[in-house]
Amino acid sequence: AAMMRTKGEAGTGNVVSAIQHARLVAGEIEWLQQASDLEFEGAVEDVTDGFMRLESMSPLIDYELISTPFGDLNTLSDGVRDVLEEVRKMGRLPVVTFSAGGIATPADAALMMQTGMDGIFVGSGIFKSEDPTTTAEAIVMATAHFEDPSKITEASAMMATPMPGLEIDTLEVRMDQRGN
């Protein structure tokens, strides 16, 4: 992989799920760093087993797993172990990590950067703001200066009305409830 994307609730203007997902990733990295050798090998096995389950995911197709991003099936465990060792050593994912979903204001963008993201994606929800162009410029400014409260304040002041936020509890289907 060249990058990783964490995901909040797209189209909501509500950054809560994005923050929760970023914290989950950070927590799992921290767990990996503190894991005993036995726990670490258990994590390698869990990831490896996830790939092996792919063959049985759909009864509609005859799918044979030949290779994975970590190599062929014979070297799968070694590849997973190598990547998890790298994560353990670096204390972060070995690829850039972007966040998406619910990021609608400069403050949201800065907050995601402060949680350790390398960047953010802003979706079509930006067009629900009063002035999408200025909103985009303000979010870019806050992202670039996420450690400078005065710049974040300045970026926030640039904006007109952002997209209206939706409460996640009111959604019929949530991102975290989709798929397997």
Question: Can you name each region flagged by the protein language model?
Answer:
Residues A2-V16, G102, T115-T135, G179:
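Glycine-rich phosphate-binding active-site loops on the catalytic face of alpha/beta enzymes
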Residues G13-I29, K128-K151, M163-E167:
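C-terminal helical cap(s) of enzyme catalytic domains, especially alpha/beta-barrels
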Residues A18, T97, M112, G123, ...:
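Conserved, mostly hydrophobic/aromatic
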Residues D37-E41, I152-N180:
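A short, charged, Gly/Pro-tolerant segment at domain boundaries
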